[in-house]
């Protein structure tokens, strides 16, 4: 298969222009010609964007549709069994460590996984006969922005100090742990912390974060298998559940024998950080030099010069609406597109000015007989 990855920008910085750009992007895929669609709806924070994508897929696609991590009616759903592993996390805190005062940081109220994991927390607390008051539950954002706010809520004046804070994902867990450390709390001696998802960054954090590992790679593999299997019967759908695996670590007081794995993970993350820092530096200087450009050809020359220093990039093309030199504003993409900048195998082949049908996504000169992956 050739793979086209469409990634929206979201409402970063509360900028409406990003939303307009996302809405335009979701009109770009040739829905009728796709052999399969894999959706990660939980990564789309804008409700209107989600509904826009779902509407296009339902009305225009004639292929197997797979939704990962979120239930979508009429699609093949690859879901995580939140109950079994979240129960395992709570059991571990209560049975293995004897904790009774637990707090729970879930995700947004309207998020499928957030709802499931919170219900599981409440159910298990009820089973153990443990209370959970208003200040023991906090709605986060599944990201790192609300660690301080969550700690303010859990540690409010007059509230008993929690023995453990269970978070519905790893981003929030590391944010909470960082804030607790900043305030002088020891983890796990004063307050234990756990996450969920099994991100590698939980091993590089100090202390290593207790988590539940979600088999993302296997979910991706199964998605491709379903696309293969259901080419002739896309209307037949199924729900497949995957189990997460409990990974008790230092942040709850469990000193697991993962020293070698931790070292390997930290070495890989060090190498990845070096690549990311170099990429960021190259983009920074490229942006400065591009501000000096007066023509699109000069822009192409600058990009061609810097792409040699940016690891992971081999091909690059800039595609603009037809007539971009004459018109100042466009509503959506034009039927025909122009490619004024093209870099193939790190060789600058600009200026081509090649025109191509928008539905092709990329011009023929950038395509290959070998399977390709493009990020748009």
Predicted regions and their residues:
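Short linear interaction motifs
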Residues: 20, 297-300, 368-374
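GAF sensory domains
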Residues: 319-376
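Helix-loop-beta substructure at the N-terminus of cytosolic sensory domains
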Residues: 293-333
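Bacterial carbohydrate/catabolite-sensing allosteric modules
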Residues: 1-297, 308-309, 315
């Amino acid at each position: 298969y050739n793979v086209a990855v469409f990634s929206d920008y979201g409402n970063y910085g509360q900028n409406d222009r990003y939303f307009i750009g996302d809405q335009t992007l979701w009109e770009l895929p040739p829905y009728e010609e796709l052999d399969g669609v894999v959706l990660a709806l939980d990564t789309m924070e804008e409700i209107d964007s989600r509904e826009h994508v779902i509407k296009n897929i339902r009305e225009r696609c004639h292929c197997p549709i797979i939704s990962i991590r979120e239930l979508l009616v009429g699609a093949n759903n690859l879901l995580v069994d939140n109950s079994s592993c979240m129960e395992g996390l709570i059991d571990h805190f209560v049975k293995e460590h004897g904790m009774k005062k637990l707090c729970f940081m879930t995700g947004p109220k309207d998020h499928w996984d957030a709802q499931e994991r919170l219900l599981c927390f409440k159910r298990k607390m009820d089973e153990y006969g443990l209370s959970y008051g208003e200040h023991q539950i906090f709605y986060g954002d599944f990201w790192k922005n609300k660690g301080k706010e969550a700690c303010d809520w859990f540690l409010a004046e007059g509230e008993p100090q929690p023995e453990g804070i269970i978070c519905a994902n790893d981003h929030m867990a590391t944010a909470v742990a960082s804030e607790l450390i900043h305030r002088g709390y020891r983890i796990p001696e004063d307050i234990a912390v756990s996450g969920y998802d099994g991100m590698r960054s939980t091993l590089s954090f100090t202390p290593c974060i207790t988590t539940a590992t979600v088999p993302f790679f296997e979910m991706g593999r199964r998605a491709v298998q379903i696309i293969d299997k259901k080419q002739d019967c896309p209307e037949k759908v199924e729900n497949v559940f995957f189990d997460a695996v409990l990974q008790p670590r230092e942040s709850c007081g469990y000193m697991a024998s993962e020293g070698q794995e931790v070292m390997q993970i930290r070495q890989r993350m060090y190498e990845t950080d070096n690549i990311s820092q170099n990429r960021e530096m190259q983009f920074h200087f490229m942006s400065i030099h591009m501000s000096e450009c007066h023509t699109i050809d000069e822009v192409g020359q600058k990009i061609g010069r810097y792409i040699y220093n940016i690891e992971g990039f081999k091909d690059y093309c800039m595609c603009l609406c037809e007539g971009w030199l004459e018109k100042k504003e466009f509503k959506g993409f034009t039927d025909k597109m122009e490619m004024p900048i093209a870099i193939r195998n790190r060789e600058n082949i600009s200026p081509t000015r090649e025109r191509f049908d928008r539905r092709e996504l990329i011009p023929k000169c950038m395509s290959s007989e070998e399977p390709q992956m493009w990020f748009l």
